[in-house]
Amino acid sequence: MAMLAGDGRQVLILPEGYQRFVGRDAQRMNIMAARVVAETVRTTLGPMGMDKMLVDEMGDVVVTNDGVTILEEMDIEHPAAKMVVEVAKTQEDEVGDGTTTAVVLAGELLHKAEDLLQQDIHPTVIARGYRMAVEKAEEILEEIAEEIDPDDEETLKKIAKTAMTGKGVEKARDYLAELVVKAVKQVAEEEDGEIVIDTDHIKLEKKEGGGLEDTELVKGMVIDKERVHPGMPRRVENAKIALLNCPIEVKETETDAEIRITDPEQLQAFIEEEERMLSEMVDKIAETGANVVFCQKGIDDLAQHYLAKKGILAVRRVKKSDMQKLARATGARIVTNIDDLSEEDLGEAEVVEEKKVAGDKMIFVEGCKDPKAVTILIRGGTEHVVDEAERAIEDAIGVVAAALEDGKVVAGGGAPEVEVARQLRDFADGVEGREQLAVEAFADALEIIPRTLAENSGLDPIDVLVQLRAKHEDGQVTAGIDVYDGDVKDMLEEGVVEPLRVKTQALASATEAAEMILRIDDVIAARELSKEEEEEEEEGGSSEF
């Protein structure tokens, strides 16, 4: 790329082949890329949303209508489009649901911004107006939100069901919602008078076979491993559990030492000493009263034999994350040296049992006292069903946790978006300058959610929006679309509820992404290297700066 100096001479700044888009061209290109991403997932929004089939280079197929999964599976290259994908990832990390809403909203905010840019309104003014609008929108959402009691399990089930609607688990939705609420409440903890939930303490284990109704909540852990020795007990009641982060093996020396053996007796003595050391390790474990051992490292074949003789059930190569969950579930402490193991380090469970699930052996740790880690074992007829059920349950866990932590919910069905849009238009009348147009554009953009819900349900979006606006003008704050019969109803009465955090996070993420993309007025893209140049780069042969 060349630029002219003051005296008219050309100054080379970048190598030949670079592409540069400046001003409106850059903004138009970025907005278009972001809107394409939003349009891709828009048809998946709501209970009647369509699914996407994604096939990768290896021929693996993913069928889903989960926004973040679709965007992660797509190989998106455009930098502005990637920013919108980040919106979905942030929403997923923060709340677990509302990813499609956030992306669709970001796309529509940029669409409205493009109209304002064509009216010669500066991007900074639009961004400032959007910021004013999102702050006011969050205030409005706080005002219209309903408080919930943490013990109100019915409302929590409704929240879980709303998150799972349209995600391939319809026939078992009520049952799965009940499991999710129980699981989340089980791992909830109180800190400084507030409910704190780490959803990582709920393990989701998938196994094909059976139906969705066979999914079960285990108040303990399910480990996808089997006993290390067939002579070990298959079932241990009143289990005393040891968690070891060290191998039950004879350590090899770190130095390259050699032992010279000159007669068979020396070799025999060497083998016997190894056996004695392993026997002592097993005796030490047995002396503490442990009858179940979960080991993060390996267990020597001979040690397996000694453990089996002592009637101890042992599992090896357990994942670190599973060990941590086992500790929370059973009350055990993870020990890094067998010599340090004591009775106080042992955890407890009513039963530890090896069971066959869909032809595979798994270890079930059940009947733990007030476990702070639990497992949901997901079943389903095919791999695609199980995968989609996992995504639905993950979303439900996220929203139930958010509702319990915040204690506030809003209606679904597009109700909060229409109400916020209505109040924002009133607020815009008091805004001076061109920012007023941006606030009004923000209000219009919010209505993309009810409009899309209507379109995806085969309804007329204009008719639905007219009805919704009329109801909200009459003060019916929770009026939303019943996508099943096309009527406008009270969403709280219909049981369509979402945590407040889903909406506030979607608004914040979408607005920030839209602002960031609007502020870009120059895109400089390096040219792609040819295969020959790539080979030169790899060989270190390129000397161009």
UniProtKB/Swiss-Prot annotation:
CDD domains: cpn60 (cd03343). It comes from Methanopyrus kandleri (strain AV19 / DSM 6324 / JCM 9639 / NBRC 100938). Pfam families: Cpn60_TCP1 (PF00118). Molecular chaperone; binds unfolded polypeptides in vitro, and has a weak ATPase activity. The lineage of its organism: Archaea, Methanobacteriati, Methanobacteriota, Methanomada group, Methanopyri. This is Thermosome subunit. NCBIfam families: thermosome_alpha, thermosome_arch, thermosome_beta. GO terms for molecular function: ATP binding; ATP hydrolysis activity; ATP-dependent protein folding chaperone; unfolded protein binding. Forms an oligomeric complex of eight-membered rings.
